[in-house]
Amino acid sequence: MELPFSAMSLLYLLVGIAGVISHQCYFRRGEHHLYPFAYLRWYTLIITAPTVVVSIVWGLPLYDAAKATGGWALTYFAGLYTSLLLYRVQFHPLHGFPGPYGARISGLWLSMGLRDRPAFQKLQELHNQYGPIVRVGPSELSIAYPEAVGIVYGHQSRCYKSTFYDNGHPMKSLHSYRDRAAHDQRRRTWSTGFGDRALRGYETRVHEYRQKLFTRLNDAVGLTVNISDWFNFYSYDVMGDLAFGRSFNMLDTHSNHWAIQVLLDGIVLYKYFVPSWLFRCFVTLPSLSKNWHRFVEFTTQKLVHRMNDKLEIPDICASLLAPLNGRSPTPDEFNLLMGDAMLVVTAGSDTTATALTSVVYELARHPEDVERLRAELLPIDADANGEYRHEQISNLPHLNGFINETLRLHPPVPSVIPRITPAEGVHVKGTHIPGGMAVFCPQWVIGRSDAAFIAPLSFNPERWYKHPDLIKHRSAYAPFLTGPYSCIGKPLALMNIRTTIARLIMTFEIRFPAGEDGSHLMENVEDHFSMGIERMPVVLTRRG
């Protein structure tokens, strides 16, 4: 049995229209990123079932029936993607915003552009070419106006977290909460772990690992050492101790713990900032997620051990366990505890190691500032090992200015921290940005912008305490973010950075290896949400 030509044409037309309608009424609205393989299964079923029906009703061999339904499927997708492309190119709310033509069509345009450079460099190039607001995806804008930081991230902002934060679904942590009320409630639990009393306890716990770090650095005096490696070993050992009550022993083994290596291998995918639906495809494939499941199992064991330990000096996990009042957690509570413990390790280690490495880079480039820092520290008593108590050095102006200036030029999270605009949209410098759009303010670009700072490319710590006129928009400086989702671990990170750098400059002379002036060392930096500095060679010599 065959349908008349006119009937067959009408059928194809209706199928094509169905594709258009599915885009306009469904895929264009709401979020559809969590279960990409569910759509694949549904489409497979929708194609397979009609094939069987056509074969039975029309009496066709399955092959011929499959050709017919395959044609319908192609027509459906032709309608869907024609509607999608026309909408994105011509009728999208962001149609009038400048940016590369390819970015209008697909979120993969930016990902493809990151094959040979990190995101923060690519975004700098785009802003240099197109201006302060650039369309970098079908529904994504990068905004380099200093005023936008408060509008997008500030306490009064009505913007909310994007689908990017669902990449680890179903695992939850403080970082991944998209619902503001749920996030605020969880943050209150976390906040008890970052008060002054808790920080003094952490300072005591950290001393052990800093002593190991300096023992290793002493062993390498006069040699070229990759300081980035040692800061990574140190930071992961510290945060392992604060998350689980036990370190990863990386300073002892001089290498990455296997679980940390799995973690580092896994974050490579983040450097491409692929759309959330595609990220979900990768992480749900068994062949690609096998190591991730090993890491989760390892974390589960570490958390169970920690829950059974009684620590003399509390760690961060003690604050997270306190609401349980000694009872066993429910499965949901355990998953949240595990997500938060992993957050302590990942967020606290990578960013702190990068910040320390960046500070050393600038110390080696600016020996005159090193002398000023030493003059500031000289009147302050250190212990026999050269350790300074944080409360003694926390308000030193040049030390804080040096750290601030380093983080301005080398922000640990340099580019994409995405938010969704509220339904009514937002206004930035007289420009209306429609609701439901993903926006972000790249700290790397803004930190080097003459709209935010005078002489933005010059390294001048005094701008933070002696020459405030060199800062046009103080609120644009947000290396730890700002607003309700700002980094809750900022006090711990700054304590660690200040005390480590103070001891470092009072113990060693720091210089680049012979023939190296440091001008190219920051060219091979990665951006996988947080900045990654794989190689930073320096030579340390003992001070007299």
Curated annotation (Swiss-Prot):
Annotated keywords: Alkaloid metabolism, Glycoprotein, Heme, Iron, Membrane, Metal-binding, Monooxygenase, Oxidoreductase, Signal, Transmembrane, Transmembrane helix
Subcellular location: Membrane
Top-level class of the enzyme under EC nomenclature: oxidoreductase
Applications (biotechnology): Notoamides have been shown to exhibit antitumoral activities. Notoamides A-C show moderate cytotoxicity against HeLa and L1210 cells with IC(50) values in the range of 22-52 mg/ml, but the IC(50) value of notoamide D is greater than 100 mg/ml. Moreover, notoamide C induces G2/M-cell cycle arrest at a concentration of 6.3 mg/ml.
Pfam (any one): p450
Signal sequence, start to end: 1-22
Entry annotated with the keyword Cell cycle: no
Named cofactor requirement(s): heme
Residues reported in the UniProt entry to bind heme: 487
Membrane spanning residue stretches: 42-62, 66-86
Entry annotated with the keyword Mitochondrion: no
GO biological process: alkaloid metabolic process; secondary metabolite biosynthetic process
EC numbers, comma separated: 1.-.-.-
Recorded metabolic or biological pathway in which this protein acts: Alkaloid biosynthesis
Topology of this chain in the membrane: Multi-pass membrane protein
PANTHER family: CYTOCHROME P450 (PTHR24305), L-ORNITHINE-N5-MONOOXYGENASE (EUROFUNG) (PTHR24305:SF112)
Family to which this protein belongs: Belongs to the cytochrome P450 family.
Function noted in UniProt: Cytochrome P450 monooxygenase; part of the gene cluster that mediates the biosynthesis of notoamide, a fungal indole alkaloid that belongs to a family of natural products containing a characteristic bicyclo[2.2.2]diazaoctane core. The first step of notoamide biosynthesis involves coupling of L-proline and L-tryptophan by the bimodular NRPS notE', to produce cyclo-L-tryptophan-L-proline called brevianamide F.
Name of the protein in question: Cytochrome P450 monooxygenase notG'
Protein species of origin: Aspergillus versicolor
Name of the coding gene: notG'
